[in-house]
Amino acid sequence: MAQVSMRDMLNAGVHFGHQTRYWNPQMKPYIFGARNGVHIINLEKTLPLFNDALAELTRIASNNGKILFVGTKRAASDAVKAAAVESQQFYVNHRWLGGMLTNWKTVRQSIKRLKDLEAQSQDGTFDKLTKKEALDRTRDMAKLELSLGGIKDMAGLPDAIFVIGADYEHIAIKEANNLGIPVFAIVDTNASPAGVNHVIPGNDDAARAIQLYLDAAVAAIKEGRGQETVAAEFVAEEAAE
């Protein structure tokens, strides 16, 4: 079973929140105290919440559910893409376009445009165009790939979203709420947990913490998809560190 330990979280700096003056009072139940003007997150609260969230991710994955990773801030972007690719899931890591979930019909048309351009770039169509036309289409394709590349094969709405940074990705959370899609989110001390079904109180800025969340989520998903050996290796590696 994919799980994290208190030591894993301490080593990754999950407990470091934001400066106290930026706090969101809704996070009070998850805060241990403050040190040098920075809120410290109570990992005794985070630990069971995180492991419960991982168990639910495993359950969703075991039913062939689609999980969309969302993390567009610079610290999370590359790691979010890597986690989605490794777990054969989906991602948005550049910019959340308004309506990405709630206006799926329009998004689907943009995805079709992206796939058409990809096909044209492979079948020789671009070679028959003028230099300017080919350049314009190449730019269009790159722009669409940046925004939609992580969801172009999703074929419908996701069954859950896993968000790095509830405050930063509030539009994605609101859209998921409107559609009844379960939200798993890392919620720092400056953010609101409202609208998050599975709150994971933790540092959403540190690279090591972000990597821990994503590695654990990947292990949980792989376990649900019947790849238990990989999930077991994750637990063993984390315990050894």
Curated annotation (Swiss-Prot):
SUPFAM superfamilies reported for this sequence: Ribosomal protein S2
Q: Which GO terms describe its biological process?
A: translation
By its UniProt entry, which InterPro entries does this protein fall under? Ribosomal_uS2, Ribosomal_uS2_bac/mit/plastid, Ribosomal_uS2_CS, Ribosomal_uS2_flav_dom_sf
Question: Which GO CC annotations does the UniProt entry carry?
Answer: cytosolic small ribosomal subunit
Record keyword Ribosomal protein present: yes
Pfam hit, one: Ribosomal_S2
Which GO MF terms does the UniProt record name? structural constituent of ribosome
**Signal sequence segment:** none
Got any disulfides in this one, which pairs? none
Q: Which keywords has UniProt assigned to this entry?
A: Ribonucleoprotein, Ribosomal protein
Report the family membership.
Answer: Belongs to the universal ribosomal protein uS2 family.
The record ties this protein, via PANTHER family, to: 30S RIBOSOMAL PROTEIN S2 PROKARYOTIC AND ORGANELLAR, SMALL RIBOSOMAL SUBUNIT PROTEIN US2M
* Name of the protein: Small ribosomal subunit protein uS2
Tell me the organism: Glaesserella parasuis serovar 5 (strain SH0165) (Haemophilus parasuis)
What phylogenetic lineage does the species belong to? Bacteria, Pseudomonadati, Pseudomonadota, Gammaproteobacteria, Pasteurellales
